[in-house]
């Protein structure tokens, strides 16, 4: 985790706790010539734009007040909901995703695939099982949790 992400996580957590919001993810990424500091937040029932603006304003005030500046380069601050394809980071995210359609990225390919989508039907501390449609049939596939690089909710077409 970069120092910018760590700093922002520490700064935003009390703001979110005060409002009963949840921190989903903080990322600091360069896209083209620009840096983006993205803070994804949520709450029970979903977060709205006014709540995102409130958190953005409070976080911006805290960042601006720090000396020395914890993020010396210019960047764009974005505070938003995680959206329909919310990342699955914490154990509670996975538990809430049981029965839902998800996308997983694997470190090592399984059956020649590193990107797999299916309905999460079971999980435990070591593995998760997806119901995956392959051509015209549905098959249950089990994956080691340690082989999962990323997971997120997915939209099924």
From Swiss-Prot:
<dbReference type="Pfam" id="PF02576">
    <property type="entry name" value="RimP_N"/>
</dbReference>
<protein>
    <recommendedName>
        <fullName>Ribosome maturation factor RimP</fullName>
    </recommendedName>
</protein>
<dbReference type="InterPro" id="IPR003728">
    <property type="entry name" value="Ribosome_maturation_RimP"/>
</dbReference>
<dbReference type="GO" id="GO:0005829">
    <property type="term" value="C:cytosol"/>
</dbReference>
<comment type="similarity">
    <text>Belongs to the RimP family.</text>
</comment>
<comment type="function">
    <text>Required for maturation of 30S ribosomal subunits.</text>
</comment>
<keyword id="KW-0690">Ribosome biogenesis</keyword>
<dbReference type="GO" id="GO:0000028">
    <property type="term" value="P:ribosomal small subunit assembly"/>
</dbReference>
<dbReference type="Pfam" id="PF17384">
    <property type="entry name" value="DUF150_C"/>
</dbReference>
<keyword id="KW-0963">Cytoplasm</keyword>
<dbReference type="InterPro" id="IPR035956">
    <property type="entry name" value="RimP_N_sf"/>
</dbReference>
<dbReference type="InterPro" id="IPR028989">
    <property type="entry name" value="RimP_N"/>
</dbReference>
<dbReference type="InterPro" id="IPR028998">
    <property type="entry name" value="RimP_C"/>
</dbReference>
<dbReference type="InterPro" id="IPR036847">
    <property type="entry name" value="RimP_C_sf"/>
</dbReference>
<dbReference type="GO" id="GO:0006412">
    <property type="term" value="P:translation"/>
</dbReference>
């Amino acid at each position: 985790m970069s120092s910018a992400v760590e700093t922002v996580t520490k700064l935003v957590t009390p703001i979110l706790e005060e409002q009963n919001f949840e921190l989903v993810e903080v990322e600091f990424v360069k896209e083209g010539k620009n840096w983006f500091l993205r803070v994804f937040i949520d709450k029970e029932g979903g977060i709205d734009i006014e709540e995102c603006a409130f958190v953005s304003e409070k976080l911006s005030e805290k960042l601006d007040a720090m000396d020395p500046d914890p993020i010396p380069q210019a960047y764009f601050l974005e505070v938003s909901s995680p959206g329909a394809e919310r990342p699955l980071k914490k154990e509670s995210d996975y538990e809430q995703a049981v029965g839902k359609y998800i996308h997983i990225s694997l470190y090592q390919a399984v059956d020649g695939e590193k990107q797999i989508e299916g309905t999460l039907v079971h999980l435990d501390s070591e593995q998760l099982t997806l119901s995956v449609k392959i051509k015209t049939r549905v098959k249950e596939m089990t994956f080691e949790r340690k082989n999962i690089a990323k997971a997120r909710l997915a939209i099924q077409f």
